[in-house]
């Protein structure tokens, strides 16, 4: 069985006239007398090049695909060339043709009304795609000095430097016209006392640690100097290099050589941040009693990404979910607060819709001070889902509206673990460094020291915001954190904590 037109007739497609090629001109392949290809024959080929061959090919393609206006491939042919530049340049549409809408302004399919989402770019003053962002204080690209910057169709005009920038309202909240950008959050990890050590060599550090623990006695100062000045990422490399070089587990060697709170601090430094947190949570809920403050401290202060990693690591390490662990050891509204925080689903935007902030403040007032009893679920929903920037605005609005700080209202309306938990969440959201400064002060105040809290905060915040915590501590208590650690601890334990602290204020 054969199909019409198949196999193709001899000579290729389309059929060629006798003695000619399928596209016109001389037949292909070339006659046997054609010289071999080489650099010395390029000139010969150029002299034999047949323009009629490709011109015929173009005419045939035009007929095949229905193109009536395909330009001739060679400018010298009659009628060849592209049409002249229309008036106004190629950016103007041809006559009797509708202009092409700009990017982001095409109507949706099916005849639906256009979306209310802003067209590209989504914020005023953004650079034209492909152009670099101008330095601060410099005119955006596309504008002459003294003239407004270029904007896309459908965008509001971009203000000149020094003028106030109009901020769009969030859609979906009627009457919202006051959206203010929050102060950009400090970059994670940019205010720690420990950073990557320059010139880091994990094999050399592994050798230092090996010598410090080899033979009779231990050189604790060498361990402090080495591990207390390396970032967590670098410590993980030291672990691997130690095992590679000596075939031994550095953690086991450290456990066998160290003791007490000094050992606990060094081992805390050697864990990754996520692994350290899940073991702190495990310790907080095991046995008789629960360290509720530890649970709230970790879950209220960590980022969404970190909390999600906590959930994955907890399940992998302990064969049960973090939520199951919380449910097994807590109850009531405090349990609901912890479970809400453990989802890692807080809004992380930095813009504030003031009308929504006012509404949330009114609803918190209606759920607490302005009713008999307290609707704890409303506090839970607002405090665990709204962004940090939004909640700061809510707390300020609550103070303005009621004349009372929201922390005092929580103390009046709640009690026990729930009161402590809600207060910790509010304080952490208001001012995270101040929250940790207060926790450190309480850990060292009075008889005895809450060493687990002291170690946990010093280690977990050492690469995040310990410099800010030191500043808040000095402001709140009139003494430096370094001073109080020196007076409340001793020995190598004091030395490693002061090394992490990073200096006296």
UniProtKB/Swiss-Prot annotation:
Annotated spans, Disordered: 1-38, 84-199
Keyword Signal (UniProt): no
GO biological process, one term: phagocytosis
Domain of life: Eukaryota
Localisation per UniProt entry: Cytoplasm; Melanosome; Nucleus envelope; Nucleus, Nucleoplasm
Effect recorded for residue 235 to Q: In ALS23; uncertain significance; increased aggregation in the cytoplasm sequestering the wild-type protein in these aggregates; loss of interaction with S100A6
A single GO cellular-component term on record: vesicle membrane
Gene3D superfamilies, A to Z: Annexin (1.10.220.10)
Low complexity biased stretches: 161-177
GO terms for MF: calcium ion binding; calcium-dependent phospholipid binding; calcium-dependent protein binding; MHC class II protein complex binding; phosphatidylethanolamine binding; phosphatidylserine binding; RNA binding; S100 protein binding
Matches recorded under Pfam families: Annexin
Bias (Pro residues) ranges: 1-17, 99-160
Record key words, sorted: Acetylation, Amyotrophic lateral sclerosis, Annexin, Calcium, Calcium/phospholipid-binding, Cell cycle, Cell division, Cytoplasm, Cytoskeleton, Disease variant, Neurodegeneration, Nucleus, Repeat
Annexin repeat ranges, renumbered to this chain: 200-271, 272-343, 355-427, 431-502
N6-acetyllysine modified-residue sites: 248, 255, 479
Family statement: Belongs to the annexin family.
Xref: PANTHER family: ANNEXIN (PTHR10502), ANNEXIN A11 (PTHR10502:SF29)
Domain commentary: A pair of annexin repeats may form one binding site for calcium and phospholipid.
Functional description taken from the UniProt entry: Binds specifically to calcyclin in a calcium-dependent manner. Required for midbody formation and completion of the terminal phase of cytokinesis.
Pathology noted in the entry: Amyotrophic lateral sclerosis 23: A form of amyotrophic lateral sclerosis, a neurodegenerative disorder affecting upper motor neurons in the brain and lower motor neurons in the brain stem and spinal cord, resulting in fatal paralysis. Sensory abnormalities are absent. The pathologic hallmarks of the disease include pallor of the corticospinal tract due to loss of motor neurons, presence of ubiquitin-positive inclusions within surviving motor neurons, and deposition of pathologic aggregates. Inclusion body myopathy and brain white matter abnormalities: An autosomal dominant, adult-onset disorder characterized predominantly by proximal limb girdle muscle weakness affecting the lower and upper limbs and resulting in gait difficulties and scapular winging. Additional features may include dysarthria, dysphagia, low back pain, and hyporeflexia. Muscle biopsy shows fiber type variation, internal nuclei, rimmed vacuoles, and cytoplasmic protein aggregates or inclusions. Cognitive impairment or frontotemporal dementia occurs in some patients.
Subunit record text: Interacts with S100A6. Interacts with PDCD6 in a calcium-dependent manner. Interacts with KIF23 during cytokinesis.
Name of this protein: Annexin A11
């Amino acid at each position: 069985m054969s199909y019409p037109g198949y196999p193709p007739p001899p000579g290729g497609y389309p059929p060629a006239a006798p003695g000619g090629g399928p596209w016109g001109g001389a037949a292909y392949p070339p006659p046997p007398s054609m010289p071999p290809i080489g650099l010395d024959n390029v000139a010969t080929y150029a002299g034999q090049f047949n323009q009629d061959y490709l011109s015929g090919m173009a005419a045939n393609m035009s007929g095949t695909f229905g193109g009536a206006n395909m330009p001739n491939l060679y400018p010298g042919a009659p009628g060849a060339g592209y049409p002249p530049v229309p008036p106004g340049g190629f950016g103007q549409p041809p006559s009797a043709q509708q202009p092409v809408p700009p990017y982001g302004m095409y109507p949706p399919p099916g005849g639906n009304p256009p979306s209310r989402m802003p067209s590209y770019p989504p914020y005023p003053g953004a650079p034209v795609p492909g152009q670099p962002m101008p330095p601060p204080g410099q005119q955006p690209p596309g504008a002459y000095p003294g003239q407004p910057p270029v904007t896309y169709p459908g965008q509001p005009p971009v203000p000149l430097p020094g003028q106030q920038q109009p901020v769009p309202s969030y859609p979906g909240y009627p009457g919202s016209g006051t959206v203010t950008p929050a102060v950009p959050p400090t970059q994670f990890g940019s205010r720690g006392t420990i950073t990557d050590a320059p010139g880091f060599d994990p094999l050399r550090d592994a050798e230092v640690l090996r010598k410090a623990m080899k033979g009779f006695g231990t050189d604790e100062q060498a361990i402090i100097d080495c591990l207390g000045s390396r970032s967590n990422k670098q410590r993980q490399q030291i672990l691997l290099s130690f095992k590679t070089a000596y075939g031994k587990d550095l953690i086991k060697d450290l456990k066998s050589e160290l003791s007490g709170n000094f050992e606990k601090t060094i081992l805390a430094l050697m864990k990754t941040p996520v692994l350290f947190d899940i073991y702190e949570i495990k310790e907080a809920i095991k046995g008789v009693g629960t360290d509720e403050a530890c649970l709230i401290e970790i879950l209220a202060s960590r980022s969404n990404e970190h909390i999600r990693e906590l959930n994955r690591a907890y399940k992998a390490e302990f064969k049960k979910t973090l939520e199951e662990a919380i449910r097994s050891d807590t109850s009531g509204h405090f349990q609901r607060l912890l479970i809400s925080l453990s989802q890692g689903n807080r809004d992380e935007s930095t813009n504030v819709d003031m009308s929504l902030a006012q509404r949330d403040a009114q609803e918190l007032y209606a759920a607490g001070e302005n009713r008999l009893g307290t609707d704890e679920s409303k506090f839970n929903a607002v405090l665990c889902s709204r962004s940090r920037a939004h909640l700061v605005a809510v707390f300020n609005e609550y103070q303005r509206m009621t004349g009372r700080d929201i922390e005092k209202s929580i103390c009046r309306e709640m009690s026990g673990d729930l009161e402590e938990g809600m207060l910790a969440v509010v304080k952490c959201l208001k001012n995270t460094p101040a929250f940790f400064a207060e926790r450190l002060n309480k850990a060292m105040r009075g008889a005895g020291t809450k060493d687990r809290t002291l170690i946990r905060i010093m280690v977990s915040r050492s690469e995040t915001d310990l410099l800010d915590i030191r500043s808040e501590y000095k402001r709140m208590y009139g003494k430096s954190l370094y001073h109080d650690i020196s007076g409340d601890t001793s020995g190598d334990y004091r030395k490693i904590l002061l090394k992490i602290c990073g200096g006296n204020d």
